[in-house]
Amino acid sequence: MNSLIRLTGDFQTARGSRPGPATLPAKGTVTAERISHIRKSLETVLSKWPKDAIIEDILVSVEYRQIVAKSNRIKEMLNGGKDSEPELSIRGARYLDFNGNHPRHLMTHYVPEATIRSTISKLRECERIVVDYFDGLMNADKMVDLVKNDKLKQKWNPAVSHTLTRSGFAQLIRDSYYVNEFRIDKPPAATDENAIVTLFETERDPQDLFEELHIDVSPANLLENSVLLTETEYRTLLERAPYLVAMSVIDLSSYAPMSDEGSASPAISSLPEYPTDEPIIGVIDTPFEEKYPPYFSNWVDYRSCLPEDIHPTSSDYRHGTCVSSLIVDAQAQNPSLDDHCGHFRVRHFGVATAGKFSSFTVMKHIERIVAENQDIKVWNISLGSMEEVSRNSISPEAALLDKLQQKYDVLFVVAGTNSDNGKPAYLGSPADSINALVVNAVNRNNEPASYTRRGPVLSFHHKPDLAYYGGDKGDTITACCGTGAYPAVGTSFAAPLVARKAAYLIYKMHLSCELAKALLIDAACAWTTPDDMDRLGYGIVPVQIEKILETSNDEIRFMLSGVATERENYNFNFPVPVSGATYPSVARATLCYFPKCNRNQGVDYTDTELDLHFGRIGNDGRIKSLLPNNQGEEDCTTDEEKARKKLRKWDNVKHIAEPLTSRSKPKKVYANPMWGMMIRKSSRYQKGSHDPQRFGVVVTIHNLKGENRIDTFIRQCSAIGWMVERVEIDNELKIYEHSQVEVEFE
């Protein structure tokens, strides 16, 4: 078996080119009538906006003609000048008709009335110019002429217009091509239960808004722009200020109850009575059984977060105790799932009782717990909602996990939630967390379990990430609670088994959270992407940790970490072994990163995009990537919808691979025999484009001749400046053990 290789080296950087003048697509046209329609829709917004609104500015939504890239969003419309550009006024984004024939963006902006009136005036002037100077219609050729015609340039001001610049006119034409109309969006419907309501971000403090609306909201029920409201309070808000409401979800979460069928049996284990220096995994779940402590209780540091007036019953303890039992000692009760990861300590936080509970309350607990326990790098959450997640916004619970993961450099392993009636259902929160490692369940036949729910989330983000064994009817997982071993079924019990592997990689193999996630996904996917990615994610994780950290002798697997700081981040020095004039190999690569996220942006939730290109370097100097991808190139013709669906644009996991089949053939070697990697970085916001973004990449190369070329690869990497390290399991374990020794100074 070949060990995993860690490469350490520098990526070169280059800034992207500045955008050129505003243009139209080759066959695109904009008529004076279209401009007039857009202007009138904006005038309607002004007339319909409540005169007694309790916020200073106006929330106006722009409907685009399609799913638009950042470069095709409005730039002249709703432009309030420096530091008031349209991208800074966005307060929400969602899709219209995403699964229909005409998917498109709807974005909500928060702008002063003066900015809207200014846009109306500019559109009126733009319409006049199109009629007077361009025969009532603009097309791509006229837009080019507008830039290159020196005579037109010289006479523009004041002959053509003294209020609208030539570049401003051109940008208005481009904006008009992509915009359908403006409007005031409708708020979400009322609910019959308590709801977590998110307000649009304005200059007003949410607490002050509720006081002015005479709605009594406790500060304890506020979390940033989200608030927990009763059914009556929410209806009052919709009656008095519906324009404030960005999104809402029911405040009820649960977990699929464990079956009462079967009975507990004595637990059998050789677990040492007390732990020593084993890694700690955090568990946030129902209470841990202390009245009848299970055999592994010395390995669990339990801390109750429940109010003192709540007295849990025996059923309240079962779920959380069973989850922790699998983390501590899963192999004892499930020999066929022995992952060779050893034992783990658990710091267990009881935040909910059996059945339904307030997800808002749990959110408040999670935020505090993670902040106060920063020594824990891996957290398991097997609680979730029975309600399906929204297609247009991330859940509040998932948004919190994404924020905490990015802020504290931790990894959440989250259960994919269960269907309780056998009917297909989308995932429940917080399994829509983008940064978390979301785990669904399979049976022993490697098929989705009968209760498995499905992704994607936000209409196109791949979730779940992975699948693992969670038991099913007649073939359960064995967990332990206070009364002994117990038959368990659900994603709740698949997740902790994956959390063990993640913790092993992060604590004992010294991998970053990004690399641990990438390595698990790469190993699960292998050379075959599942047909049912909506339920299986990228595949089923191998049982034994060696299958993740080692490869067969005809494969080379290496990993590297970096920080993307500029538009282009590249290294063209990967010496993939050559045989004669060919590369007798196929390859795959997996990129993971944890971007900052903004729930207020709706479907445009992630702030940063990293686009992965890896492959041979052609004679033109470009990377011939494993997945054909010309995003970022001058000849790019990929539209935003295809980029999101096919190339995973804005998804924080990128997996690209060549197929490995009996028909796979060696590839040509070009003038430069090296392979290259390019990571193109872009931001939702122009001002955020230089913020650094950490990433991890795992690459696997399979030799079609069955040859072991790892020594050649290591030797060549060292010769060209890479720092090369074999990740030997035994060596890494010794390093971990030595790091846990306490040194006493006299």
Regions found by a protein language model. Give the residues of each.
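Long, charged/polar, low-complexity intrinsically disordered N-terminal extensions
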Residues: 1-186, 724-746
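C-terminal subdomain of the subtilisin-like protease fold in secreted/lumenal serine endopeptidases
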Residues: 507-586
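Mature extracellular/periplasmic domains of secretome proteins
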Residues: 8-12, 270-277, 340, 357-380, ...
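Extracellular S/T/G-rich loop segment that most often corresponds to the catalytic His/Ser-adjacent loop
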Residues: 285-287, 426-503
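Subtilisin-like peptidase catalytic core
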Residues: 22-47, 72-81, 93-95, 112, ...
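Exposed low-complexity, polar/acidic, P/S/T/G-rich flexible segments that act as propeptides
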Residues: 584-624, 682-746
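Protease zymogen maturation seam
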Residues: 5, 158-160, 164-195, 204-279, ...
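Subtilisin-like serine protease catalytic core
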Residues: 270-303, 309-359, 409, 433-435, ...
